[in-house]
Amino acid sequence: MAETTATPTQPVEKVSDVIKNYRPAKAFRGNPKADKQVNVTSLDFDDQGDYLVASGEDEMIQVFDVKEGKATKTVPSKKYGVHLARFTHHSRQILHASTKLDDSLRLLDLHNESYLRYFTGHTDKVVSLAVSPGTDAFLSCSKDDTVAFWDLNSRNAQGKLKLATPYLAAFDPSGSVIAIASQSTSFVLLYDFRNYDKAPFASFDLSPLEDRYTPTTKGRAWTRLEFSNDGKSLLIGTDYHGHFVLDAFEGNLKAFLVGKHGPTGRAAPVSTTGKSLGQGDVCLTPDGRYAIGGSGEQPDTLVWDLHQPPDAKLFLEPMTRLPYYRSRTTLAQANPRYNMFATADKEIVFWLPEDPTKMAEK
């Protein structure tokens, strides 16, 4: 792939004006020093969109400068393993889950490459991490069937919920509402974050939707839970058939996103197959209008326009397929500030909108 020196620009252009023009601008191996390529397992941007952090099966944490388009730091985590690397609201601090030794969460200072704090309390693997958009609070979901509520300034959990397979969690944009997905029961539960010890104020039963749209993977394929930035939609990504977009207030299905061809090859949190870890192959753009995701076993990246009406059965086809030939998309993450997004499988790819006139020349 020909690399470009183009850097992301602030979104003075509407996403709708450039969404069809995104092309791979730069690709990075998960770990350039490794003998062979390994799977990347998580991606996350900092609040300002200036840095991307990635974790991989090689137990390395990599940080990339988005503007410069280069890797700036690699930190090994061989002792504990690493998954779900997330920026706090400080771009020099990384929160991540452990994959071996114990099931603690760890807060890493990138400046001196040392751990500031361990968060202990889970007794099985952590499969989802959600950071509050406005405070130092965060949530963790574990295979011990608990959701733990934390503050970055304390090593002990502020509270816990015991639920059946609560393997995905997300904050709404205000930070006042949390969604928790219980895969085995096919429910999504909404809680007031300040009163999470009370009963959920809403619960959405997706069992009828799974029977209709994902019958062969019912109860075992949810991979992503994300609110749109306007708080009106809730995305539930799945590993195989497609993705659900719900009305975040009523739980009604807005659309089922189709167009994937086969699974991503990554394990859903509920899975016991031993497949490589991931965080879902679909995400929402910051304007809330588009979903970007993988096409399963094919290398193209799909884009769905959520403002377009679905068909009578609520199926929504991709508005475009963004071409790539070197690897498929098993992870996808949109930059919160700039017109760019990142995807990954065994390599990490930065996508930028290309000049339409140059595209025509090609």
Regions found by a protein language model. Name each.
Residues M1-K362:
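WD40-repeat beta-propeller superdomains and closely related acidic/aromatic-rich repeat-like regions
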